[in-house]
């Protein structure tokens, strides 16, 4: 898990990807990085 994901933030998917170094996505309330 990289960071929490908030459905109210329209940029959350991008922030999650950036937090994961370009490869990650929101899954429920968590930002999960793809290894």
Curated annotation (Swiss-Prot):
Cysteine pairs bridged by disulfides in the record: 2-19, 5-26, 16-31, 20-33
Tissue spec: Expressed by the venom gland.
Pfam families, sorted: Toxin_5
InterPro entries in the cross-refs: Scorpion_toxin-like_sf, Scorpion_toxinS_Cl_inh
Residue list for modification Arginine amide: 35
Compartments, record wording: Secreted
Function: Toxin with unknown function in healthy organisms. On glioma cells, interacts with chloride channels (probably ClC-3/CLCN3) and MMP2 at the surface of glioma cells. This complex is then internalized via caveolae, thus inhibiting the chloride channels necessary for cell shrinkage and tumor propagation. Has been shown to weakly inhibit TRPV1 channels.
The protein, known as: Insectotoxin-I5A
Organism of provenance: Mesobuthus eupeus (Lesser Asian scorpion)
Organism lineage string: Eukaryota, Metazoa, Ecdysozoa, Arthropoda, Chelicerata
């Amino acid at each position: 898990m990289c960071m929490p994901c908030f459905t109210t933030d329209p940029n959350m998917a991008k922030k999650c990807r950036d937090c994961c170094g370009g490869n990650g996505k929101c899954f429920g309330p968590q930002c999960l990085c793809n290894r």
